[in-house]
Structure formats: C-alpha cells, structure tokens
C-alpha cells in the first residue's frame, strides 16, 4: 500500500509520513492510486458538506470550496496559475513557456485565471447544493485525478529529472488503463446518465487540453498536469450544475 500513501501525500495536505524516500518504481505505481485519492477527498467533502446542512447556502458553498482547496494544499491551483502565465507570456515559444513556468512569481493573467476558476467552482457548488445534488463533490476529485493518470499514460513528460520524470518513466501502462476503465465504469454506476454526460464533456476537455500541450511543449509538465486537474474538476461541476 506504499504507493497509495505516496499518492495521498503528494496530492494533498493530509499529515501523511512515509517511512523513507520512495523508489522510482513506487513513485510510478503511485499514479495508479490517484483516482482512489480522489475518492478519499470526495468522501471527506461529502461528509463536510453534510455537517454544514442548514447553513446559509452561500456560506455552505464557500466553506466547501475552502475545504477543497485546503485538502489539496493549493498544489494544483499553483500549477494552473503557472500554466496560465506561461501560455500567454510564452508567445507560442516552447522554451520561453517552460522558463516562465519555473518563475515562482504570479502575473496578472495567473491571478485572473485563479479568480475565474474559483468563482465558477463556487457558483457550481452553490447550484449543486441548492438542487440537493452532492454527487459532484465525489465525481470531480475522482475524475480530476484520473485525468492526471491518463495524461501521464499517453503524453511525454518534457522536463528531465525530478519527480515527474520518475512518475512518467515507471508508470505501469497496462494496470493504468485498467484503472481508468474501472474509474469510468464506477462514475456511470454512481451517477447514471449524468455520469455519462460528465465523462463525455471531460473527454472532450482532456483531449483539447492535451492537444494544446503537445502543440506548445511537445508533452506535459507537472504544472500543466495540475492545470488539467483543476479544469476538469471545474468541467465536472459545471456539467452537473447545468444538467
């Protein structure tokens, strides 16, 4: 179960302590447990939302979103911000885009992107709470993290060295595809036709975002993987809120 604990530590802010430095093979296998980490986060969000029952709706939605951000430690939002800055500031140039991604400072495009994504997430969560449809709080973390597995399965990693390279190089391809298939089936079983609609929308978003990465970078980075997760979580919530 060490790969699961690696995934849980890497993807969130829960107080997980590993017994030592993981081997590259264990890092690669940890990707297989990303959807399961999404299940853990989703169940925590569902439980927290249930505790807030009776709270004013806007406050309820704001607290759920705050808990969501705290669970992930803002890791993927940071990737989204870096990607937004790099995409507009890179002017279509691969090396300039990669260089801007490494800059820890956030420009105005990053701030605007984060505000818009969080605002849309808040509005979608509010709509789901109003309609007593909480399944999105489970599906969004699961699909977002499954998308990261899918990205590493079929997309070159363009930064040599580091954690991302170890993940990409040592990911078991066959089991990874089975995990993705099982995740998709579970989403449909849980949400029925709504789950089918969510998967279709997310598939379109996934392949479009992957195509953007391939055209600009020839692959993905940790930042673009985090951006993908955030945008697919948003796609899940918006799809369910609009159905």
UniProtKB/Swiss-Prot annotation:
Its cofactor is Mg(2+). It comes from the Bacteria. Its EC number is 2.7.8.26. It catalyses: alpha-ribazole + adenosylcob(III)inamide-GDP = adenosylcob(III)alamin + GMP + H(+); alpha-ribazole 5'-phosphate + adenosylcob(III)inamide-GDP = adenosylcob(III)alamin 5'-phosphate + GMP + H(+). Keywords: Cell inner membrane, Cell membrane, Cobalamin biosynthesis, Magnesium, Membrane, Transferase, Transmembrane, Transmembrane helix. It is found in: Cell inner membrane. One of its GO terms (molecular function) is cobalamin 5'-phosphate synthase activity. The keyword Cell membrane applies. The chain crosses the membrane at residues 31-51, 57-77, 109-129, 135-155, 188-208. InterPro entries: CobS (IPR003805). Disulfide bonds: none annotated. Joins adenosylcobinamide-GDP and alpha-ribazole to generate adenosylcobalamin (Ado-cobalamin). Also synthesizes adenosylcobalamin 5'-phosphate from adenosylcobinamide-GDP and alpha-ribazole 5'-phosphate. Belongs to the CobS family. This is Adenosylcobinamide-GDP ribazoletransferase. It comes from Pseudomonas savastanoi pv. phaseolicola (strain 1448A / Race 6). The lineage of its organism: Bacteria, Pseudomonadati, Pseudomonadota, Gammaproteobacteria, Pseudomonadales. The gene is cobS.
């Amino acid at each position: 179960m060490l790969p699961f604990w690696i995934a849980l530590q890497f993807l969130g802010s829960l107080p997980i302590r590993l017994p030592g430095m993981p081997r590259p093979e264990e890092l690669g296998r940890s990707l297989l447990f990303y959807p399961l980490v999404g299940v853990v986060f989703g169940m925590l969000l569902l439980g927290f939302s249930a505790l807030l029952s009776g709270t004013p709706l806007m406050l309820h939605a704001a607290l759920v979103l705050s808990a969501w951000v705290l669970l992930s430690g803002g890791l993927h939002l940071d990737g989204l911000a870096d990607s937004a800055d790099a995409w507009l500031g890179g002017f279509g140039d691969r090396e300039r885009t990669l260089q801007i991604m490494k800059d820890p400072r956030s420009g105005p495009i990053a701030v605007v992107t984060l505000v818009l994504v969080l605002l849309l997430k808040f509005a979608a969560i509010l709509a789901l709470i109003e309609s007593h449809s909480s399944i999105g709080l489970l599906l969004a973390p699961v699909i977002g993290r499954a998308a990261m597995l899918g990205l590493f399965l079929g997309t070159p990693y363009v930064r040599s060295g580091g954690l991302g390279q170890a993940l990409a190089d040592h990911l078991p391809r066959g089991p990874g595809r089975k995990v993705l298939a099982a995740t998709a089936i579970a989403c449909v079983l849980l949400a029925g036709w709504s789950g089918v609609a969510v998967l279709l929308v997310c598939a379109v978003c996934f392949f479009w975002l992957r195509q953007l990465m391939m055209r600009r970078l020839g692959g993905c980075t940790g930042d673009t993987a985090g951006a993908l997760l955030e945008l697919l979580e948003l796609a899940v919530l918006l799809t369910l809120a609009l159905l």
